[in-house]
């Protein structure tokens, strides 16, 4: 199953760093937050990624092209014609398609633009600026069991956008843009989607969190997988610093691939 990651945003609220690189390439513990997200999916056996790039998309492509240089010790032997020797080579079991989905394309438009890379298959989608410790295997199992077109991961947060009204059977009954209460249940990404969802997206200007998700909710085709564990997006410098401190502590909740 392919994993689509939205990685085309500007990240304008995160310090000077976001002026020079795409938001998903902003680093936590020396590695882009995009890498952290991919590591979690990979831990659960999902290694086929489609990155919806946009702003400074060349930086994402160059980072993957030079991945060995980021993760291995190397020797450059100029006496042998600029030969490079990679030591203790570490290769992720990943297949990564980095797709330029446009500079100002909305979230739905970016998903629509990578349809040809997905085909007629169930796929996953998440945002390139949020990490969590959701059990992705259980998320996929839940999606397959209910048989609806879409599942999103829902978490409890204070005063956020994308607020959900959820029924007793976990059906999303309404999708609102603004919270009116603290402790609201919100959309955290980490979605599982059927290919029919592409039909709800009209073009580049479609915001996926508006018309498509609202239509799916109205038709009873949007389910929520309620996650009671850790989730955090990286929208501000304060949130970035908080994630950095968690990583430096050696006990980052989302680092499931290293937990015993």
Per-region residue spans from a language model:
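N-terminal glycine-rich phosphate-binding loop and ensuing alpha1 helix
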Residues: 1-67, 98
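A structural signal for short hydrophobic beta-strand segments in well-ordered beta-sheet cores
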Residues: 25, 164-166, 213, 224
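Catalytic-core segments of class I nucleotidyltransferases/pyrophosphorylases
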Residues: 122-124, 131, 135-144, 156-159, ...
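Structural beta-sheet core signal
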Residues: 3-5, 51, 125, 150-153, ...
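Conserved beta-loop-beta/alpha segment of the NTase-like Rossmann-fold superfamily
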Residues: 60-168
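Well-ordered alpha-helical segments embedded in enzymatic catalytic cores
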Residues: 33-36, 110-113, 212
């Amino acid at each position: 199953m392919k994993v689509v990651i939205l990685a085309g945003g500007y990240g304008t609220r995160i310090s000077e760093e976001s002026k020079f690189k795409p938001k998903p390439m902003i680093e936590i513990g020396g590695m882009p937050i995009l890498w952290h997200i991919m590591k979690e999916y990979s831990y659960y056996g999902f290694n086929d990624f489609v990155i919806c790039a946009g702003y400074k998309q060349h930086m994402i492509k160059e980072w993957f092209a030079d991945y060995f240089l980021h993760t291995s010790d190397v020797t450059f032997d100029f006496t042998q014609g600029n030969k490079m020797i990679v030591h203790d080579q570490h290769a992720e079991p990943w297949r990564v398609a980095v797709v330029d989905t446009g500079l100002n394309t909305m979230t739905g438009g970016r998903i629509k633009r990578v349809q040809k890379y997905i085909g007629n298959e169930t796929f996953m989608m998440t945002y390139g600026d949020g990490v969590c410790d959701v059990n992705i295997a259980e998320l996929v199992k839940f999606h397959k069991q209910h048989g609806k077109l879409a599942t999103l991961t829902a978490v409890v947060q204070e005063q956020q956008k994308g607020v959900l009204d959820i029924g007793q059977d976990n059906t999303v009954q309404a999708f609102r843009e603004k919270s009116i209460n603290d402790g609201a249940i919100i959309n955290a990404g980490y979605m599982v989607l059927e290919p029919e969802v592409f039909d709800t997206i009209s073009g580049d200007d479609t915001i996926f969190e508006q018309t498509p998700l609202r239509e799916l909710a109205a038709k009873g085709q949007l389910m929520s997988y309620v996650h009671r564990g850790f989730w955090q997006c990286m929208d501000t410098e304060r949130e970035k610093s908080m994630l950095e401190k968690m990583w430096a502590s050696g006990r980052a909740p989302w680092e499931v691939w290293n937990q015993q």
